[in-house]
Amino acid sequence: MERKSYSIDINRIAQYAMYAYCIFALFSLAFSVCRQAGLSFRTSPILIPISPILVTIKQLVLQLAPIALWGIFRYTLPAGVKLLRRCSELMVLYYVLSFILGQCFNLHLVTMMQNGQITQMASILTWTESTMGLISVIASLVAGCHLCSKHRGNMRKLGIARVLVFIAWLLCSNLLPAAVFYLAGNTQQAAFTCMNLISMITTTSAYIYAYYRMYRVIKL
């Protein structure tokens, strides 16, 4: 594909976003694994005062880095690849919406419960985010299949990475929990703990690889 020229160093921005995402995704994975194992960073006298700050930074980075990477990827695409442009725009829209809704819930700008029931506004916003999440998964899969079939080199590797993300989402969020519940029942806590660990490691690895491949495409 023909590449554009830019007045700002978008490669450097994409590089920082990719590294930040990888670092904090691994930190989030370690945090979750420790929590599953019954450990906590808050028991450390060194990390007690800074752990809330780290968690806040982690949440912001994991929400904002995908916006930057997908936005830059969309910006670098030529006009001829309309399908990829539309899929990228959907991904940016989803991550922006998720960030806004996340901040609304975290800052208590939206009332979640009233008289022991979920408020109508909270239900609408949650449904909207879930719907956009499903649409973004489909858009990511469509983009991945298109990249695999129509392109070569780093673009094709990015397509494979996006397909792997979809497979990880399908297995870890849908098939694996149902299988574990069917086989082990709801009394085998060890089975669910093991499933959660496998899901977290698989999903984190898939996303890190996908954003690395996206950075490689942007860097061309």
Positions of PLM-derived features:
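Transmembrane alpha-helical segments of multi-pass membrane proteins
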Residues: 12-22, 82-100, 159-172
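C-terminal transmembrane-bundle signature of multipass membrane proteins
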Residues: 27, 86, 146, 164-220
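Interfacial non-cytosolic loop connecting adjacent transmembrane helices
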Residues: 35-51, 106-128, 176-198
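Alpha-helical transmembrane segments of polytopic membrane proteins
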Residues: 50-64, 123-137, 192-204
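N-terminal juxtamembrane cytosolic/stromal segments of multi-pass membrane proteins
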Residues: 1-17, 219-220
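Alpha-helical transmembrane segments in multipass membrane proteins, preferentially the mid-helix core
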Residues: 133-160, 208-216
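Alpha-helical transmembrane segments of multi-pass membrane proteins
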Residues: 21-39
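Membrane-interface helix-boundary motifs at transmembrane edges
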Residues: 74-87, 148-158, 219-220
